[in-house]
Amino acid sequence: MIENKKVCVILPAYNAARTLERTVAEIPMAVVDDIILVDDASSDCTSAIAARLGLHVVRHAANLGYGGNQKTCYRHALERGADIVVMLHPDYQYPPRLIGPMAAMLAAGPCQAVLGSRILGNGAVSGGMPLYKYIANRALTKLENLLLGARLSEYHTGYRAWTRELLAALPLERCSDDFVFDNQILALAIHRGYAIGEIACPTHYFPEASSINFARGVVYGLGVLRTAFAYRAHRMGLIRSRLFQP
């Protein structure tokens, strides 16, 4: 708990058995009140390990996708009374020690969302991010900043923290069940006028860390572009995008 606000960590998981215990071991329980793991129909023992670790476990009977997993995570976090929700991937790619600082930024009040940016501090490439992913990240981010009217260092990190107010207000059910969910929720937050902060975040790419392949990365990139152009066209009154309706 930070400043009397309940902090919940959500772990959207799929076949995370090899890295889950190491990730959970480093979560700062001095500030975290609740940990929820949503298992998206894993074929390994992710749920069993999570239960042994004492996490609140929700298991999908069928795979709902990365975005679908997050929707379940956020719904359960709000139902369990979270004031601040931090999403941490259970693949040990992001450092759990940043949960405290990210939650504190929200508890202090200036922001309603905080992103753990791999670009701030120049830690992306040194942490093992493939060069083509780094270049794509930078190119997409520049275009998104132009179309969304924002000034973020990146939109593609999986390390995020949100206030209850933001999550309860955004129509998350309109967002994709796939990876572009991450981008759409940020576009919605910007559209609704929420303040988004950033914190420098080192990252670690290694064989056990989850990552989408090149083909799915292309699909994701196209989805990012569609979202950004739809946002700009909606704001200009050229179209009425369902995603950005009141």
PLM-predicted stretches and their roles:
Residues A16-T19, S42, P95:
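Donor nucleotide-sugar binding loop of glycosyltransferases
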Residues Y14-M29:
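Short, well-formed alpha-helical segments that are part of the catalytic scaffolds
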Residues A41, G65, Q93:
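A short, conserved beta-strand element in the Rossmann-like catalytic core
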Residues A82-Q93:
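Short beta-strand-to-loop acidic/aromatic patch adjacent to the donor-nucleotide binding site
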Residues C8-P12, I36, R59:
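Short hydrophobic beta-strand elements that form part
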Residues D39-S47:
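A conserved acidic beta->alpha catalytic loop
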Residues V58-E79, P96-F179, F206-A215, V219-L225:
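Acceptor/aglycone-binding surface of glycosyltransferases and processive sugar-polymer synthases
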Residues M1-E3, G149, E173-P246:
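Hydrophobic helical membrane-anchoring modules
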